[in-house]
Design a protein with these regions (language model features):
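Catalytic histidine neighborhood in serine/cysteine hydrolases
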Residues: 210-226
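Alpha/beta-hydrolase fold nucleophile elbow
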Residues: 53-66
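Short beta-strand immediately N-terminal to the catalytic nucleophile in serine-hydrolase-like folds
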Residues: 61-63, 88, 191
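Conserved alpha/beta-hydrolase "acid-adjacent" motif
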Residues: 197-203
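Glycine/threonine-rich phosphate-binding loop and adjacent beta-strand/alpha-helix elements that clamp
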Residues: 211, 232-234, 247-471
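Accessory cap/linker subdomain of secreted extracellular hydrolases
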Residues: 2-6, 12, 73-183
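Short beta-strand/loop motif that positions the catalytic acidic residue
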Residues: 184, 190-192
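Cap/lid segment of the alpha/beta-hydrolase catalytic domain
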Residues: 1-51, 99, 106, 365, ...
């Protein structure tokens, strides 16, 4: 499959393409331990390649997801024959993105762990859709530590490790290559998507390169993890071929972003671009959203029931139905609050990091807050722009929940409205909060919670957007 999807387009343009199986997979010796041996094996592979009689004097490393991560694993020790690297939809500390302290990402690591556990079985690709349905059912298993058994009949070591070990525990030592990023000595072309799971880490890596003065380009398109189009391929080939030949790609500013809403590519000198200032849009009574601070008002309430969890709709997911989608049905649920501006009198352009501060109280000490930014068109259709979740302890006391949403580049057009959703979950993208404080892997009880969102002068809940008024 990789041969036809990745190798053929590159080979047709003059590259010799080498795709390597990870240790312990598809006939490769040793034991498969995801992410563990990629530095050791990657450096050994590069040493072998340059000694081959067919080697043509220049190497470009390219690939997405895991195939991008392995580039960062060797980035600070590249032989001189490597002329450029092109990591796509990836970052230098891959698994750690799933283990963020602000909320356990569930669906992606579970699906990937289940997939690699059976990837060498006969007919694995043909059984893919049936496996997706089994995974969906399995993710509701209690305790969650048995979900992989429900999906594939046995435990997945990777899934068990994700459920059992926090990001700072020794199990993950050696798979974090963030410290290598600033030491890369060759040009980098980093390609990502606004709805990709690894985008925050990918932008962090680019910032490191930028601050270290390394030669680097960034392209971010309107893509999910698996939906990049020919634009990304053309960028890779143009950049890779030029450096392989000892030339420079056509000059342009280092950052190229697809601005959604405007539906156009724009070039910038840096990430985040200059000239965008944080603007607070405050939650108001009666579901309003406005730039002025709120006055006195009562809190809004909803009940979150993990036995009927608020579903993940679109957004940062791996499979079908991800990305920008219609949120009408989601917003009709009683466990989702919405706050919406009046129709905009002029375009509002948002590019950069997005966050929210939600004053919140739950009937239980353990709760989650999910915030989503949406664009509502003149027909009333609400489509998601970016979102994020934070898990709270001590939530039975009034607390300001700081939610880090995904970065974005979006133009809200005149006549449209800006909307913020507030809820307590996006299952199965994020693990549902059982409300008991028991670890996800072992929790067997699910407690419903009554939630309150405050928006008054003393508790000014808001979404903070990096805004430049469009001319």
């Amino acid at each position: 499959m990789l041969g036809s999807v990745i190798a053929r387009p590159l080979a047709e343009r003059g590259f010799q393409v080498l795709i390597q199986s990870t240790r312990g997979t598809f006939g490769s010796g040793g034991v498969f331990d995801p992410f563990r041996f990629e530095r050791e094996d990657g450096l050994a592979t590069l040493e072998w390649v340059v000694k081959q009689p067919w080697f043509g004097a220049a190497i470009v490393l390219a690939g997405g997801s895991y195939l991008g991560y392995v580039q960062w694993a060797v980035a600070d020790s590249l032989p001189p024959e490597v002329k450029a690297i092109i990591p796509q939809v990836t970052e230098s500390a891959l698994t750690l993105e799933f283990l963020r302290k602000d909320g356990l990402t569930l669906e992606t690591p579970f699906s990937w762990g289940v997939m690699v556990a059976g990837q060498e079985r006969r007919g694995a690709l043909l059984r893919g859709m049936a496996q997706v349905r089994r995974n969906r059912r399995a993710l509701s298993t209690l305790p969650l530590g048995q979900a992989d058994v429900a999906a594939i009949g046995h435990h997945s070591d990777y899934v068990q490790d994700v459920l059992a070990y926090d990001a700072d525990q020794p199990r993950w030592a050696g798979i974090d290559h963030r410290h290598r990023v600033a030491q890369v000595s060759v040009p980098v072309c980093s390609i990502g998507g606004w709805y990709d799971i690894f985008l925050p880490g990918q932008l962090r890596d680019f910032l490191i390169l930028q601050e270290a003065g390394r030669p680097a380009r960034l392209m971010v398109g309107p893509w999910t993890h698996i939906s990049a189009d020919g634009t990304a391929l053309r960028e890779s080939i143009e950049f890779g071929l030029a450096h392989a030949r000892g030339e420079q790609p056509p000059p342009r500013p280092p950052v190229r972003l697809y601005v959604m809403g405007e539906e156009a590519w724009r070039d910038f000198d840096s990430w985040p671009p200059g000239g965008y200032l944080p603007q607070r849009f405050h939650l108001q009574p009666d579901g309003a959203l406005a730039s002025q601070p709120p006055g006195e008002s009562a809190s809004d309430r909803y009940r979150y029931d993990p036995a009927d969890p608020t579903p993940a709709v679109g957004g940062v997911r791996m499979g079908r139905g991800s990305g920008r989608v219609d949120n009408t049905a989601l917003e009709a649920r009683p466990d989702v609050l919405t706050y919406t501006t009046a129709p905009l009198e002029e375009d509002v352009e948002v590019i950069g990091e997005v966050s929210a501060e939600i004053w919140f109280r739950s009937s239980l000490p353990h709760a989650d807050v999910f915030a989503r930014l949406c664009d509502v068109d003149p027909r009333g259709r609400s489509r998601n722009v970016c979102d994020g979740l934070v898990s709270l302890s001590g939530a039975d006391e009034l607390i300001c929940a700081a939610v880090r949403l995904w970065p974005t580049a979006y133009r809200f057009k005149r006549g449209h409205r800006i909307r913020v959703q507030v809820s307590s979950g996006a299952f199965p993208r994020y693990a549902r909060n059982p409300g008991t404080g028991v670890p996800h892997a072992t929790a067997t009880r699910l407690l419903p919670a009554d939630q309150e969102v405050y928006h008054d002068g003393a508790h000014p809940s808001a979404v903070i957007l990096p805004v430049r008024q469009a001319q």
